[in-house]
């Protein structure tokens, strides 16, 4: 039992350590192996075999399984960014809601792009100019901007029913569930998340105005899309195709993203600055590797945690439990 307690303590310390170090901007590529090493030592596992074998295998398995999704999602997002299609979607949402509903407009703009399969790290750059303009019209401090944009793309849009994002895809492949698993609870939770995010951000905006804070333009300004942009309907077509194909057919997310890319190239060809295409694709490829490696190094820690005495004890305890399966899960 002592080894189980030590193992559990090691996992807890590793999780806390990862949280603190990552918030202090230490690279996950460094944090992941260190956390795995700590758990290995405190669990009494063979250090060399666990770190160079189990950990590296966990990292490699995640990379091999999901690299194409990250790459194609980045390319699709980059096409939306350089063509101005992402900005067009943002402008359309702004027209629907106006500056008075700044937080709602920013949230929905980010969520729409996320539900279209675009990588979240691309969405930030695509939405930023539109969100900044909204914040200027609403006279809100810009430090609130990342919160509402991330709230739109990293919460319900990443985990909700029908989402083609990596969180949903991993669940589908690991558990064999459809994209709409837990449809009613998932939709209800998504609505609750969206409402609470908007409520909280509006509350913070009201407090900021009460303190006399105002919009301050960023140094150096923001690069705006120059040249013609696709029409509103045309801008929505590739994203809609990805969502529909992902949920209605069985061709897989990689094929869906490829179709989205082909549609984007065909529909946005007049708006794409072809002289920038090579550098854009190189940047998309490079950033996709960075993102997936950062994620995979943390996933590798989970592979090591699975072979610890504490994990085996916890699984046995939960499997023998008579509690509600949802609570146990």
What are these regions, as identified by a protein language model?
Residues 48-137, 274-329:
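Membrane-embedded alpha-helical segments and adjacent helix-loop junctions characteristic
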Residues 2-10, 17-50, 72-84, 242-275, ...:
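Structural signal for alpha-helical transmembrane segments and their membrane-water exit/capping regions
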Residues 18-25, 77, 110-118, 152-158, ...:
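Transmembrane alpha-helix interface/packing and boundary motifs in multi-pass membrane proteins
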Residues 1-6, 23-25, 52-64, 177-186, ...:
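Interfacial loop-to-helix junctions that mark the boundaries of transmembrane helices
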Residues 8-12, 30-33, 67, 100-108, ...:
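Hydrophobic alpha-helical transmembrane segments
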Residues 30, 115-131, 144-145, 160-167:
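Transmembrane helix boundary and interhelical junction motifs in multipass membrane proteins
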Residues 2-11, 15, 184-280:
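Long, contiguous bundles of hydrophobic transmembrane helices that form the permeation core
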Residues 133-229:
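Membrane-core helix-loop-helix motifs of multi-pass transport proteins
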């Amino acid at each position: 039992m002592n080894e189980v307690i030590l193992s559990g303590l090691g996992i807890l310390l590793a999780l806390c350590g990862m949280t603190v170090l990552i918030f202090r901007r230490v690279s996950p590529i460094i944090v992941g192996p260190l956390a795995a090493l700590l758990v290995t030592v405190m669990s009494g596992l063979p250090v060399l075999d666990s770190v160079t074998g189990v950990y590296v295998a966990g990292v490699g398995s995640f990379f091999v399984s999901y690299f194409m999704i990250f790459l194609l999602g980045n390319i699709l997002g980059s096409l939306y960014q350089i063509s101005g299609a992402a900005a067009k979607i943002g402008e359309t949402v702004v027209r629907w809601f106006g500056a008075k509903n700044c937080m709602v407009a920013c949230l929905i703009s980010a969520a729409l792009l996320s539900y279209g399969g675009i990588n979240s790290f691309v969405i930030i750059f695509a939405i930023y100019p539109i969100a900044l303009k909204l914040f200027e019209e609403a006279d809100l401090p810009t430090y609130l901007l990342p919160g509402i944009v991330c709230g739109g793309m990293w919460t319900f849009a990443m985990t909700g029913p029908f989402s083609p994002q990596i969180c949903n895809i991993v669940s589908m492949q690991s558990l064999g569930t459809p994209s709409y698993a837990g449809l009613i609870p998932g939709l209800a939770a998504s609505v609750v998340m969206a409402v609470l995010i908007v409520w909280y951000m509006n509350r913070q905006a009201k407090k900021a105005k009460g303190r006399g804070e105002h919009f301050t333009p960023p140094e150096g300004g923001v690069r705006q899309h120059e040249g013609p942009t696709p029409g509103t309907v045309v801008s929505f077509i590739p994203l809609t195709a990805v969502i529909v194909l992902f949920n209605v057919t069985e061709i897989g997310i990689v094929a869906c993203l490829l179709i989205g890319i082909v549609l984007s190239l065909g529909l946005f060809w007049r708006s794409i600055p072809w002289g920038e295409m090579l550098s854009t694709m190189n940047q998309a490829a490079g950033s996709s590797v960075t993102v997936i490696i950062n994620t995979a190094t943390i996933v590798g820690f989970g592979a090591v945690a699975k072979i610890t005495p504490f994990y085996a004890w916890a699984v046995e305890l939960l499997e023998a439990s008579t509690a509600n399966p949802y609570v146990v899960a």
